[in-house]
């Protein structure tokens, strides 16, 4: 049976499950549950009460009580069978809950718990955790994708997942076998762009980490052992508002307790900020946003109100945070680290100014690798076998021509949704026909709303707006994760949260053949009128408004900067500034080099930056007011480093490698010639290697124009490189030589070095680095200016 969302119109309700279960199975479940109730410290009622007490609004609306009952019974059955000796606190918060993050819930636990328990029966808790991660690797491997998170069953169906989906699968699998597990995030890296998620597992009274679907031979080992040492924040959201496990609490909500786990990984410090007014007085009640520079924005990772002493604090890595403090219409921006920091509210909303910030991340100090060479070799052989197992699994996709669904949607969309989207459908307009609105779970809504809305007197945008304003109860506090509630569920319950109410507005419009969307740039709710103009809608106002827009024209002069064409999210970003803080303009469709940008009237902050090879950032902040019908010209400033590339290590250009198709080894120098060259040692799979290939592809034009050889050793291919020399590194001689020359004591690929024929290394990167292209391009540009080549 294919698992689907639990809904009267969707396949796989609890009633259907019970009908398809054998009589023997039903008797077994009932008898096991009865036995558990008599011997366990927590029973079915206590479990259900615990889940419902902190259940997000969407989960309570979409999934019936029978769904939760079936999963609770299975969880209690596993607890009795496996007898791991898990204390009630860890079991209730880290085994019982189905929800890991913001994924679509499915039937994973009831489908796979027995399989997983059989696989690890008789093992120790540590062995079982490692083995389940191997099972996860048999099901899925890494591939980047969009921000919507697949449920674990859909990830298995796909065979692929980004780190957030791999970790959801791994946590779900561990919990299904009765082992406490949680998903841990660095919300943003400080030394490079992007973020990462992995798994912590509770073994012998302590939390240990694993790379999800990236099994190793021991716990506390993953490819991110080095990058995690440069993190500024590591956190997880624990199901339940009253969790008390000893970790630092970042925030408590009605649904979860957000905790900071950085102290379990690396040295940390208390970053303390004191908010002051212009006269030096401490300001109470100011909003203090702790931010990390990433993807060219100051990404907010935590937010507090200053106390009576004007202070707010957060445990962080030993590096710079960017602080935006604000109260009423005043604000201030500064970099902070350690305990003695102040931010002055010396700016006013609407005030135009510019400032420079230099942001320094923590230094690298890789976590210890406790595995032996023999363990590594055995694990590598297992990974190859697991790759073949995964490749043998079918990975079906649906066909949905004309519905404007993404590749990911075609993995988990149900037949019912596809059929419903065609109900009384004659349009080809994507803003009418597509069942995908935002990141909500896809559940049929068109037939339901097209039939019931007119009965409720709803036929126009004005009537939709009035109905949603007057008849839908908002319960934002019950959905602090911001989970997107499917429109059919909000309609039936007459209850929603603010963002999901927006989704219901779009669904109602589309069901009545009115083009509608949530603007992908600024998140505003819109419909398209008969003149083809997009009109903004405020559901708390009775009057739709035509958008008043102006143009921001960014004037970029390259000068000595190595970047020829700054890119959005890489070199600059634009955020709206208001009393509510900042809101990023998501200009995903902005064409490279197009610096004339239409924006709604408002006050904006332009953040630009150059990330240097050591991970630090030279950032620039510029604010601007955009007025209707006016083109406002603002310089786009990139602060490049004035220093020439430095020699940072040494290597032997006479070291041999085996060129592709050759029978005898040859020296690097004989393949590259005199001058500079690039060496890339990488595998074809694994998240760090996938990112390296994508980064090299992104700057292939610059590398081709540079004209120097790129020696690629290992299984990675970069077809766009015109000067690539492919080969292998027998016995790892080249890799070991580079690591010795850089005095690097850690293992891990990719290894990328920019060298010259004198044996000097001027750029080096090892492991995960999503800023590789930007850094490498900058060094090459500097070399060209210095040497003319």
Where are the predicted features?
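Short active-site neighborhood of thiol/selenol oxidoreductases, capturing the structured segment around
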Residues: 668-692
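Short Pro-Gly-centered beta-turn/loop motif in secreted/extracellular proteins
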Residues: 311-329, 336-338, 409, 590-617, ...
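Secondary-structure boundary elements
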Residues: 40-161, 194, 377, 382-493, ...
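Short, internal strand/loop/helix patches
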Residues: 711, 720-755
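Structured interaction patches on ligand/partner-binding surfaces of diverse proteins
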Residues: 329-352, 612-639
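Short, acidic Ser/Thr/Gly-rich low-complexity loop/linker segments typical of extracellular
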Residues: 294-315, 578-593
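Hydrophobic/aromatic-rich core segments of domains that either
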Residues: 118-134, 143-153, 158-251, 323, ...
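Short, ordered, surface-exposed loop/turn motifs in non-cytosolic proteins
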Residues: 278-297, 318-320, 559-584
